A protein has these predicted regions:
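Nucleotide-sugar donor-binding catalytic core of glycosyltransferases
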Residues: 2-55, 64, 84-91, 117-257, ...
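Pol beta-like nucleotidyltransferase catalytic core
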Residues: 24, 265, 269-340
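Short amphipathic alpha-helix with an adjacent loop that forms part of the alpha/beta core around
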Residues: 68-73, 157-159, 298-305
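Surface-exposed amphipathic alpha-helices with a cationic face
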Residues: 93-100, 186
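Conserved donor-binding/catalytic loop of nucleotide-activated donor transferases
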Residues: 240-242, 262-267
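An amphipathic, basic-hydrophobic alpha-helix
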Residues: 56-77
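Active-site proximal beta-strand in glycosyltransferases
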Residues: 97-112, 130
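Short N-terminal targeting/anchoring amphipathic segment
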Residues: 10-11, 70-87, 106
Length: 340
């Protein structure tokens, strides 16, 4: 689909700045884009409340979105592009279609539908639905399309690794059993392997909630965690000076996380709990070590870190780049195969 001069309403959660990169790409392709956050109130602590009380968040969002629609009813759109759409109400989608009867609505889901149960009720409003999760794609007959990495992440391997405290890196939001798995991995590492852990929690009160009500966090210390999302420059520096990345997917999802694709783009090795990764076309056991999230201990040999990363075919980097992702989102004939 040619996006030149197309008017797009882009609705997406604020997620470590990725919404800005997607917006910029759409504009570079010639589209005129208006951005709305998937959460009308999306400060970190508000985001946490959205996860705890999704029905309340949807009602509050609906009021704000309908007000926005009323104030902008003189604007017309060719496309609505939604990522996740957890808090969009049926009324908002209905009124948007009433105001823009010729507009196409596209939905991309980058979470498991088990984690976003309200989205399915809104499928009927969309002309095209894609998912990053292979299981959801099969079950609900959606278009399967994995996530992406940014183009600048594909250059992070250019500088050779020297002495670094960031040999093995974890960057991500702490949820479910992630903290426990990270601690188990730390204990299994060879003595000469160092780590840098950027464990993000939305707000200090969320940490205390976990610590009081979840036994996994009984020995957790507040200073272990970061309460602000990581800045892109720090992220790039950490990846540049590491040789491997820890990836722990949510227990309810099978789709590859953003961190997995970032590591692929940066040509870094991956230690992951997602066994489904072996079904993808870029899988190489030299580059990727699969571990069980339920094991009490692991064996991670030094050789995994010292052996050279084996590059994959250049066509795969193009396929999993943000350019390839956007092209597939708006393509009318996506026939790519991402699995072996």
């Amino acid at each position: 689909m040619n996006l030149k001069e197309k008017k797009i309403l882009f609705i997406c959660p604020r997620f470590f700045g990725y919404e800005k990169f997607i917006l910029e790409k759409l504009q570079l392709m010639g589209a005129s884009v208006i951005f709305l956050s998937d959460r009308a109130f999306d400060k970190p602590w508000q985001s946490a409340l959205t996860k705890l009380f999704p029905s309340i968040a949807t009602k509050l969002n609906s009021i704000l979105y309908l007000k926005w629609l009323k104030n902008n009813n003189n604007k017309s759109f060719d496309l609505m592009f939604v990522i996740n759409g957890q808090t969009l109400s049926k009324q908002f989608l209905y009124e948007f279609k009433e105001l823009n009867p010729h507009a196409k609505l596209i939905l991309y889901i980058w979470d498991s539908l088990k984690n976003k149960t309200t989205i399915q009720k809104k499928f009927k409003f969309f002309d095209r639905i894609l998912s990053f999760d292979p299981n959801d794609s099969k079950k609900y007959k959606l278009i399967f399309r994995p996530l992406f990495f940014l183009n600048n992440q594909n250059n992070l391997n250019k500088k050779s690794l020297k002495k670094s405290s960031n040999y093995l890196v974890f960057i991500g939001t702490i949820h479910s059993d992630r903290y426990k798995v990270i601690k188990t991995i730390e204990k299994a590492l060879p003595s000469n392997v160092k780590t840098f852990l950027y464990m993000h929690i939305q707000a200090p009160w969320v940490f205390w909630y976990y610590k009081i009500f979840n036994n996994m966090y009984r020995n957790a210390v507040k200073k272990e965690f970061n309460f602000l999302p990581i800045e892109q420059k720090l992220f790039e520096n950490l990846y540049r000076n590491s040789c491997a990345v820890i990836d722990i997917e949510h227990p309810l999802q099978k789709g590859l996380t953003m961190r997995t694709l970032e590591a692929l783009g940066a040509q870094k090795k991956i230690i992951t709990t997602n066994s489904d990764i072996k079904n993808y076309d870029f899988y190489n056991p030299n580059n990727i070590k699969i571990i069980s999230r339920t094991a009490k201990d692991y064996t991670i040999n030094t050789s995994f870190f010292t052996t050279k990363y084996q590059e994959i075919d250049s066509s795969l980097y193009k396929k999993y780049s943000i350019d390839g992702w956007i092209k597939d989102i708006f393509s009318t004939d996506l026939m790519k195969d991402f699995c072996r």
